[in-house]
From Swiss-Prot:
The keyword Isomerase does not apply. It comes from Escherichia fergusonii (strain ATCC 35469 / DSM 13698 / CCUG 18766 / IAM 14443 / JCM 21226 / LMG 7866 / NBRC 102419 / NCTC 12128 / CDC 0568-73). The gene is clcA. The lineage of its organism: Bacteria, Pseudomonadati, Pseudomonadota, Gammaproteobacteria, Enterobacterales. Belongs to the chloride channel (TC 2.A.49) family. ClcA subfamily. This is H(+)/Cl(-) exchange transporter ClcA. Signal peptide: none annotated.
Length: 473
């Protein structure tokens, strides 16, 4: 009797193929999979840190304003308490930065860009506590700073921390988790996941190494950080300006003019920031005592303004819906714009731990609203709404200053939930970016990073000369 050998060979061959496939999977390099898993861990931690930072800033601001209520009957005492509360909080932030982690000063975004190029160190064990608590002091004191700078730098440092703790090896893992943390930090700061992704791809395009693994990791990190944010803050737009009307096609040329205005102002604003940095450095001369006292004076000034003219202090998120609704006169808009330009320059250029995204969004809103009010008066036949120009202006200053128009556009759309205004926003942002580029202005973060690297090189050269001199003696 013959045996049916082919029927027995087929299952055996299938089992051999399965075993070979399993062996190949086990022998394959696990680094890409590990990076993606760690990206989820980084995104989760960054989201939780951003929520804690946001809640902490809000709590400090509420406590500070609550302390003023007890002195409401005594106006001189009220002003004194307003100044001192903000000054003390600001001095705390300045002291932490100067004493323990100077790289935690300012926005922190240029530091992440430098780290992605392996030109700046990432000392997460110092930067994380200093940036977190120092930022609580300066932002809680009412200084004109944004929360996105701290969350981006905290996010990048969390990425490096996770890398070190789990001992992942290789340049790809180090670079990818650093970028993932930064993107997750921006997404959690503004509840804007797509803007967080575009921020890495567009703003950090010279430093970001685009690979399938790196971009997937950024996506995963941003998703997890946004989920963490929405668990604690609900799924609502960060800035509630209501649903604005669409912009008719025959009015789009006005948005191009608005973009040209921002294209002129953006490079000028960048020069003012760098010039103010030089001026304030001459004031304190690198002395920690003078620097902390100077920071306390700036913080105290913001505290006074927060009581006397609230629209001129703070990050600006409370100002944006009020300005967009048209609740300010033209004269008041001009005053707010000038005052916020001055306070933004003082706060950001002094090296306080805090970002500049939010203050620039507020400045763009105020200038856009003022332009819209003029357009409404000059062209009544168009039935214009000044608020649409305010929304277009929000992202235009970002586009002109840091040269990231896509990030600015998507960020504003996600924050305000007015997607019908995407066309006028593109026109405004494109006009602002092109003119700023043609005038030769350098992107703000690139200019700050170049200064930091030049200072670092000078310090290294001075140390090497001192070491050589000591050896010769």
């Amino acid at each position: 009797m013959k045996t049916d050998t082919p029927s027995l060979e087929i299952p055996q061959a299938a089992r051999l193929r399965r075993r070979q496939l399993i062996r190949q999977l086990l022998e394959r390099d696990k680094t890409p999979l590990a990076i993606l898993f760690m990206a989820a861990v980084v995104g989760t931690l960054v989201g939780l840190a951003a929520v804690a930072f946001d809640k902490g800033v809000s709590w400090l601001q509420n406590q500070r304003m609550g302390a003023l209520v007890h002195t409401a009957d005594n106006y001189p005492l009220l002003l004194t308490v307003a100044f001192l509360c903000s000054a003390v909080l600001a001095m705390f932030g300045y002291f932490l930065v100067r004493k323990y982690a100077p790289e935690a000063g300012g926005s922190g975004i240029p530091e992440i860009e430098g780290a992605l190029e392996d030109q700046r160190p990432v000392r997460w064990w110092r930067v994380l506590p200093v940036k977190f608590f120092g930022g609580l002091g300066t932002l809680g004191g009412g200084m004109v700073l944004g929360r996105e700078g701290p969350t981006v730098q905290i996010g990048g440092n969390i990425g490096r921390m996770v890398l070190d703790i789990f001992r992942l090896k290789g340049d790809e893992a180090r670079h990818t988790l650093l970028a993932t943390g930064a993107a997750a930090g921006l997404a959690a700061a503004f509840n804007a996941p797509l803007a967080g992704i575009l921020f890495i791809i567009e703003e950090m395009r010279p430093q970001f190494r685009y690979t399938l693994i790196s971009i997937k990791a950024v996506f995963i990190g941003v998703i997890m950080s946004t989920i963490m944010y929405r668990i604690f803050n609900h799924e609502v737009a960060l800035i509630d300006v209501g649903k604005l009307s669409d912009a008719p096609l025959n009015t789009l040329w006005l948005y191009l003019i608005l973009g040209i205005i921002f294209g002129i102002f953006g490079p000028i604003f960048n020069k003012w920031v760098l010039g103010m940095q030089d001026l304030l450095h001459r004031v304190h001369g690198g002395n920690i005592t003078k620097w902390v006292i100077m920071g306390g004076a700036i913080g105290g000034l913001c505290g006074l303004l927060g009581f006397v003219a609230p629209a001129t202090s703070g990050g600006g998120f409370n100002l944006i819906p009020i300005a967009t609704a048209g609740n300010f006169s033209m004269g008041m808009l001009v005053f707010i714009f000038v005052a916020r330009v001055i306070t933004t320059l003082l706060c950001f250029s002094s090296g306080a731990p805090g970002g500049i995204f939010a203050p620039m969004l507020a400045l763009g809103t105020v200038l856009g609203t003022a332009f819209g009010m003029v357009a409404v008066e000059l062209f009544p036949q168009y039935h214009l709404e000044a608020g649409t120009f305010a929304i277009a202006g929000m992202g235009a200053l970002l586009a002109a200053s840091i040269r990231a128009p896509l990030t600015g556009i998507i960020l504003v759309l996600e924050m305000t939930d007015n997607y019908q205004l995407i066309l006028p926003m593109i026109i405004t942002g494109l006009g602002a970016t092109l003119l700023a580029q043609f005038t030769g202005g350098k992107p703000l973060y690139s200019a700050i990073l170049a200064r930091t690297l030049a200072k670092q090189e000078a310090e290294q050269l001075a140390r090497s000369k001192a070491a050589s001199a000591s050896e010769n003696t």
